[in-house]
Amino acid sequence: PKCVAVGETGLDYYWKEATREQQQPLFRAFIRLACMYNKPVIIHNREANHDIINLLYEEKQNGNLRNLRGIMHCFSGDSEAVKQALDLNFYISFSGNITYKKSHLPSVIPLVPHDRILIETDAPFLSPVPHRGKRNESAFVRLTAQKLSEIKEWTLEETGKITTANARRIFDISN
């Protein structure tokens, strides 16, 4: 076994269990750790996109993150957030929330190039339709893949091959 990434780490302003001032130094430490060991960082972002992006750009400009790369886990941002994440050398991972009727994510998914897109379950949360509101499980990732296939106009097989190749690349996993 080997470590393939650092995280999930990030900023979460939704729960208010820890202040911004408490969270940000720890987040900086984790992203520096990922870069020190040349590992991708998996970023959790809940109501903190502005601070996460600014912090990453600031660290990168200070020369602390020469080999910064990672995954924007369970992405829920807008088109600007997609552009910023891609500029920072991140992959963008989507979960079951892309299947929700009122989700804005189907409009941003086309902005993500095929070589930077991933899917995930975020189990036990964010179950895709028709399981919304129930406990999520790994088997439901197929529903997320089907929705992604529909949006990207790929076959389900193409989606599987693309997202698997991307996961292998970002996590440096050989066949």
Stretch-by-stretch model annotation:
Residues 8, 34, 73, 85, ...:
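Conserved, mostly hydrophobic/aromatic
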Residues 1-40, 88-100:
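Active-site gating/metal-coordination segments in enzymes
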